Amino acid sequence: MSYNGGYGQNNGGYGGGQGGYGGRGGAGGYGGGRGGGYGGGGRSGGYGGRGGGGRFQDTRVELTTPEWDLESLPKFEKNFYNEHPNVTARTDREIEQFRKENEMSILGHDIPHPITSFDEAGFPDYVLNELKNQGFPKPTGIQCQGWPMALSGRDMVGIAATGSGKTLSYCLPGIVHINAQPLLKRGDGPIVLVLAPTRELACQIQTECSKFGASSRIRNTCVYGGAPKGPQIRDLANGVEICIATPGRLIDMLEAGKTNLKRVTYLVLDEADRMLDMGFEPQIRKIVDQIRPDRQTLMWSATWPKEVQNLARDYLDNPIQVTIGSLELAASHTITQIVQVVTEYQKRDLLVKHLESALADSNSKVLVFASTKRTCDEVTSYLRADGWPALAIHGDKEQHERDWVLKEFRQGSHSIMVATDVAARGIDVKGITHVVNYDMPGNIEDYVHRIGRTGRGGATGTAISFFTDNEKKLGGDLCKIMREAKQTIPPELQAYDRRSYGSHIRYGRGRGGRGGRGGWGGRGGGRGGGRGGGRGGYSSGSNTAPLGNRRF
């Protein structure tokens, strides 16, 4: 794979800082410290002083693509990889066998050999100590190959399933990268920029960055929509080495002059396929055009459709690629897939039946997918009235409520979460034992993505799907996915096989979900002795529905 990216000339460059930020102390890092500042003519303007409690002035400017002059830009270090003697000593046959065992395929030239342990990665002690403190037994497949790639300073593509350890694959090399750069000065933007499709994923990435960056005093902020801008603006003005952002809110900050990307030398596009599915391609391109072209760019994705390949060709320079598993669309073989062909009116009682079985184990967590926000609320209200500990999460919920719902679900205080696709994207909750497709998704890619929330990390899981005649065009693709995973296909579903309806599997963008259905007919008033509404200040709508007598 060879991507060509010729870059135009420029006459930009960094301006000098206006008064330095205090050093972070004790970072050590690669490449001999971070002493000198950037030279160059000083920036005019910069951030104006903010009087106590004063408002930020929001003067928007249209972003234009700079003309880059690489010769005038300050040099920076991005290759920190020194191969461990154990890695060097391995034969080509041993390396090939390791990659085969981990379903690892590579593409490109001069690709570093994979590592097999944390010590072989060559991380400094402050990173290794944190890894050991977190109790990770060994690197995942994507980390074994991704860390040497990222630490070598190369542009790279990493393709692996959600939940495979991609976040640490770029987070830890990013921390090493930061510690080798000069300190931020007043008015500087971040050094590492991570773009993510959803606020939930962005917040999860921030958690990992905070955890592993604390010992180096690396600051970060999370910039996303649906939350007040003030705290995000203050973080950016105070200076952060890492900015994790959703594309839309970051564009707002850039156009309002609240930050800049002149210092970014390490760019991450996480869940690139999902960002394109959600229509963020214009924003991504506008953002990346603001970053110096000799940066290091890392693209991470669960799939490799043509749209993502085109983005890689445009913005990655001679990249190397690692893929864990097959590029063919497939479901994990650790997931038991159960598909029931039903009518709309049968769904509610069948859901309760499956919940009774699933929650017989008190450690179970059940994620239920609904196609619309309305259905999501209706399912949740019914379940709560019937005594089930369910909470809803969707796009109409305020961010603080979404955070609370996720916390309750993660901790097991509420073992059922009902979600829409958009709300669930980027959510990584450990220990989900069951996924229920109350409504089928609009395309087979989303089906595989949904059920992949269970059966992670070698654990087993169960996916239950209610299939109606409205989804008959999905039948052939669904049979193909189940057949590949060696699942039992019910005769009722086989009637919808591709032999009758044709295959609709695509590897590009999804086709969008079905429109919402009308509401249920009500079922008389729940079971007596309701428990009152949700917790004050957090819950709204269906999440405040009284909880009936416990079903278990």
Curated annotation (Swiss-Prot):
Family statement drawn from the similarity comment of this UniProt entry: Belongs to the DEAD box helicase family. DDX5/DBP2 subfamily.
Listed Gly residues bias regions: 515-539
One Pfam family from the record: DEAD
Motif DEAD box: positions: 270-273
UniProt gene name: DBP2
InterPro entries: DEAD/DEAH_box_helicase_dom, Helicase_ATP-bd, Helicase_C-like, P-loop_NTPase, RNA-helicase_DEAD-box_CS, RNA_helicase_DEAD_Q_motif
Positions contributing to ATP binding: A160, A161, T162, G163, S164, G165, K166, T167
The record's note on its domains: The Q motif is unique to and characteristic of the DEAD box family of RNA helicases and controls ATP binding and hydrolysis.
BP GO terms, sorted: nuclear-transcribed mRNA catabolic process, nonsense-mediated decay; rRNA processing
Listed name of the protein: ATP-dependent RNA helicase DBP2
Segments forming domain Helicase C-terminal: 337-497
Start and end residues of each stretch annotated as Disordered: 504-552
Enzymatic reactions: ATP + H2O = ADP + phosphate + H(+)
Alphabetical keyword list: ATP-binding, Cytoplasm, Helicase, Hydrolase, Nonsense-mediated mRNA decay, Nucleotide-binding, Nucleus, Ribosome biogenesis, RNA-binding, rRNA processing
EC number: 3.6.4.13
Subcellular location(s) per record: Cytoplasm; Nucleus
SUPFAM superfamilies in alphabetical order: P-loop containing nucleoside triphosphate hydrolases (SSF52540)
Main localization category: cytoplasm
Subunit structure: Associates with polysomes.
GO molecular function: ATP binding; ATP hydrolysis activity; RNA binding; RNA helicase activity
Task performed by this protein: ATP-dependent RNA helicase involved nonsense-mediated mRNA decay and ribosome biogenesis through rRNA processing.
Motif stretch (Q motif): 116-144
A single GO cellular-component term on record: nucleus
